[in-house]
Amino acid sequence: MKRIIPFGREFGSGGRELGRRIAEKLEIAYYDQEIITEIAKRTALSEEYVRRIEEKRPVMHFPIHTGHSIYLISEPTFYPDFSIYTKQHELLRELSRKSDCVIVGRCADYILREQKPVRIFAYADMESRIKRCMERRPEDEHLTEAQMKKRIAEIDRSRAKYYAFFSEQKWGARENYDLLVNTSGADIKKLSSALCAYLEAMFE
């Protein structure tokens, strides 16, 4: 049985680190930044541009979702963004066929739903998320806790809109995942070990 683990996460929940540690412990592939790099190559766009666009809802005026046909559009001002989404969906399917893997975000739980993945979503209380983000912010970034809280909320809204647009489902809703993990105050390293035991049981 192919071990495909899409990993959704609230911003600042530690979901990215948790997914990476799980991949390391299970000795399977881990995809996050690597997806941005590959999409940039395939679209001839900069990695920075892809990073800004990839988990934001497309600016389009007609419905598109992965469960139905994806229509190409002729309007050149829309094409670069749209190309990112179509290439990303293609790449996620390629990666999942290639090997067992953890894929962070990018609506992978929905896009790869036919492969029967074990879908995980990490969340945490706002206090824990602010603390984590403040501890990991770049040295030249001087946001206050109030400003960080605002950024967290903005990123979460963006991810929720992206997810709803492509899946027509609610981001973070328990019915869309196999396991929801509250990382508030948790030791991510220890938590990853517990989750690996769960995953091994699920994939038997």
Where are these regions (language model features)?
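Glycine-rich phosphate-binding P-loop
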Residues: 6-20
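Short, amphipathic alpha-helical "lid/cap" segments that border enzyme active or binding sites
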Residues: 89, 188-196
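Small-molecule kinase domains that catalyze NTP-dependent phosphoryl transfer to phosphate-bearing small molecules
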Residues: 60-65, 142-188
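Short beta-strand-centered segment that lines the nucleotide-binding/catalytic pocket of NTP-utilizing
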Residues: 29-40
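Conserved phosphate-donor/acceptor-positioning beta-strand/loop module used by diverse small-molecule
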Residues: 114-134, 143-155
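ATP-dependent small-molecule kinase phosphotransfer cores
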Residues: 40-100
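RNA pseudouridine synthases
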Residues: 95, 105-120
